[in-house]
Every structure is written in C-alpha cells, then in structure tokens.
Amino acid sequence: MEFYTLKEANANVDLLQKTFDHLATLYKLITDLKNDSYVVLWEREKNHNKHYGKDDGLDLNQLELNRIINQIEDLIDPIIQKGIIVRDIKKGLVDIPSIKEGRIIYLCWVSGETEVSFWHEIDAGFSGRQLI
C-alpha cells in the first residue's frame, strides 16, 4: 500500500477533479440511456410487443452502455493504480492512504473541494471526517 503526505495528496486534486467531472458527464449519459430503455420497454408492453425487435433501440443502448462502462473503467484505473481508493463514483469520493502518528489513516477528498482538507480513521468512514 502506498502512503501519501498531504502535499502529495493535494498534488493529485487536479487529476481527481478532472476525472470526476468527466465521470459526471458519463453518469448523465447512463441515466439518459436508462430512461430511453424504460420508454422502449414501456412502449413494447403497451403495444403487446408488436412491431418491436432489434430496431427498437435497446441493442444500441446496450452497446452504448458497454462503451460508457469501458470509458469509466479507463478513467478510474489510473487513480486505483496510484493506490487511491474510489469510494463513490457519483459523489466523487476518494480515500487516500496516509500515516498519522504512526497509524494508517485516510485523507479524504470529495469532488468540488479545492484541496484535501479532511482525514478519518480507516474504520470511521465519511461520517468520521475531521478537519486537518
């Protein structure tokens, strides 16, 4: 496990913010695809599955969803490779391993914060965040 100083953690904030901004856009696309799929399924049901098949858009939606999921994985992988723990993609919440007074802690950052300003014990979670 790699451990970060506060300075090293803050050096990653720009990368993290750009990544989660892009992820928010992809999340919106997923939501739109999901809504489109629900409409198609509703119309299929309403019309008792008449005149619906491969041309109704569901197959294309699934292909697009798979493409977006691959993009999400490609965006998150470099963060994970750095040893940063992605806790919530939608919120942009990460924990960054660090050492405080000889024990392992997590520096905590959420998308929108301009710097890493919080930490918590490894078993405390987000609700246990404390100001640095």
Q: Language model features by range: what are they?
A:
Residues 4-5, 11, 53-54, 59-61, ...:
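Mixed-charge, polar/low-complexity N-terminal
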Residues 22, 48-51, 120:
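Histidine (H) residue identity feature
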Residues 26-28, 34, 48, 90-93, ...:
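Residue-level signal for alpha-helical context at structural boundaries
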Residues 66-132:
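Glycine-rich, aromatic-bearing surface loops/beta-hairpins
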Residues 5-8, 12-15, 22, 54, ...:
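Generic structural signal for short, flexible, solvent-exposed coil/loop and linker residues
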Residues 2-3, 51, 117, 125:
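Intrinsic disorder/low-structure terminal segments
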Residues 29-70:
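Structured domain cores in non-transmembrane regions
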Residues 1-43:
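Long, hydrophobic N-terminal alpha-helical segment
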